[in-house]
């Protein structure tokens, strides 16, 4: 009887240990190209992941915690040029996000909170700041096209145009 209990406890420990381990997963498209790869723990995406377009080009990369995006993420177009990058917290976009045009130049920087614009959004044209808007919980509350008035209103005398 004692031996059976020890054996059962040992078996349960082995099962628990096996299911709590991180395993590396790869999923493929029908054409054989890699679709996604990353770490699974307790049947959830946990850790660093990469996603690919069907042509094999990197689509996005970043971290998960319990199936939710977290930390810093990068997104790319099918031609490998960066599309956007920014922070996730519990699956929602937060902090500064940078958006790139099709040549890889920043055309938009925006502060987000829980997937909504919250703070400043800066619009660039040919790498030059042209417009600024201020948002609160996704709603635009003010916009500046005259950067001198924006700098004055916000005490930003050192901001480069």
Where do the protein language model's features map onto the residues?
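Bacterial Sec-dependent N-terminal signal peptides
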Residues: 1-24
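Glycine/tyrosine- and acidic-biased, solvent-exposed loop/turn segments at the edges of beta-strands
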Residues: 16-161
